Amino acid sequence: VFNYRELAQKYDVPAWSDAQVLAEVLSRKLQQSDPLEAVGELHEEVVGTFSFVAITERGELIAARDPTGLKPLVIGSFGFDYGVIASESCAMDVIGADFKHDIEPGEAYLFTPYSIERKRFAEPNPRYCAFEYVYMARPDSIINGISVYEVRMRIGEKLAEEAAVEGADVVVGVPETAIPFAMAYANRTSTPIHMGFVRTGRRIRSAIKPTQFERLVGVQLKLNPIRRAVAGKKIVIIDDSVVRGTTTKNTVNMLRNRLGVKEVHVRIGSPRLIAPCPFGVEVPARDELIAAHLTDEEVAAVTGADTFCWLSIEGLVEAIGTPREHLCLGCFTGQHIEVAQRGMEFLKELKEAVAG
C-alpha cells in the first residue's frame, strides 16, 4: 500500500506498516458500514494492492482481494459448515480441508456463524504476479486456477526448447523450487537427471538475504552436494532465478573446485530479473541485479559457468498459460502494472511536497 503513511495521518493511527494501517482503517470503516461495504470503501482510499483476512469484534471473518489479484487468496471448506481462507490451496490439503476456488480479483467474502456472503466491490483488472509461479508459491498449490507444479514442468520444457546443452552427462536441479524445471528439461532432452544436492533440512531463502555473507552461508547451510552424482561430468544445473549472482558463483565454484565437475552449464527457469518489485517481494535495487547489466556471456564469466541462459519472457508467459496482459511481469520487463506506476507517482509527489 503506497499511501499508507497518508492514510495513517488522515485517520490518526500509527504508521508501523501498511498492513497495520490497512487494519486500522478497515476498523474505522466497520464502525459506520456493513463489513462488505467497508471493504469497498477501503479500496477507494488505497493506492496499492492487497489480499487480506480480518476478524471483526463480532467474530466475523472478512476476506478480500484487490482488483488486480496480484497476490493469491483462496477459499475452501472444512466439514459441513466451516469456511477456510488461505493464501495458497496447499494449506487446505495440509489440514484436510476441501479447496473450492480462488477469491476473484475485486471480490470480498464475509463469514458469520450462520452464513457466507460474497460481494464484488470493484471490477476485476487481473494482473497476477508471474513470480509466484516461478519461485514464491509452493508446487502443490493451485493459483488462479492453474497448477504451479504443471507450470514449472512446462518451464523446464521451454528451457529445453530454448537453451538445450548438447552432450550433457547429467541434469541437476537446485532444491527445491527448480526440481520440476530440471525433471522436465531432462525428459525433453533425454539427459539423465541426478540428485546433485541434498537439503540439510534448513529452509532458507538465500537469494533474498540482505548481505552477501548471509547469502553465501545460506547456500552452505541448506545444500550439500553429492560428489558421486556429478564428479568429472558435464552437467546442466538448473535454478529458479538469479538475483545478484553471488550464490550461483559460489555453487559453480564448489562444483568445479571441490567436486571436480568438468563443465557447468547454468539454465535459469525465469527471465532476467532486471527491476525491483514495488509490492514487497525482496528483490534488491536495480544496481545490484546482475541480469540488468551483463550479457549471458558476461554472467557466465563472472559466475565461472561455461554457459549461462535464462528463460525468455515469452516462454514464461506460455508456460503459465495466462494472457500476458493479465500478468505482472514488472521485475522481468521494468514496466510495472498501472497501480504500481500510480503508487510511485504518489510517492514522488509526496516526497516533493515534503521537500518543498
Located regions from the model:
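Conserved hydrophobic/aromatic pocket- or pore-lining residues that grip, position, or stack substrates
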Residues: 109, 159, 171, 181, ...
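Short, glycine/charge-rich flexible loops or terminal/linker lids adjacent to PRPP-binding catalytic cores
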Residues: 190-236, 245-246, 274-284
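Conserved short alpha-helical segments that host acidic/polar catalytic motifs at enzyme active sites
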Residues: 1-104, 110-169, 174
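Short glycine-rich phosphate-binding loop at a beta-alpha junction
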Residues: 166-177, 181, 265, 309
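Extended, hydrophobic alpha-helical segments in both membrane/secreted and soluble proteins
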Residues: 171, 178-185, 189, 193, ...
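Secondary-structure transition/capping motifs at alpha-helix termini
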Residues: 32-33, 164-169, 187-194, 229-231, ...
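Flexible loop/turn segments at secondary-structure boundaries
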Residues: 61, 70-71, 92-94, 117-118, ...
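PRPP-dependent phosphoribosyltransferase catalytic core
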Residues: 43, 58-60, 65, 96-98, ...
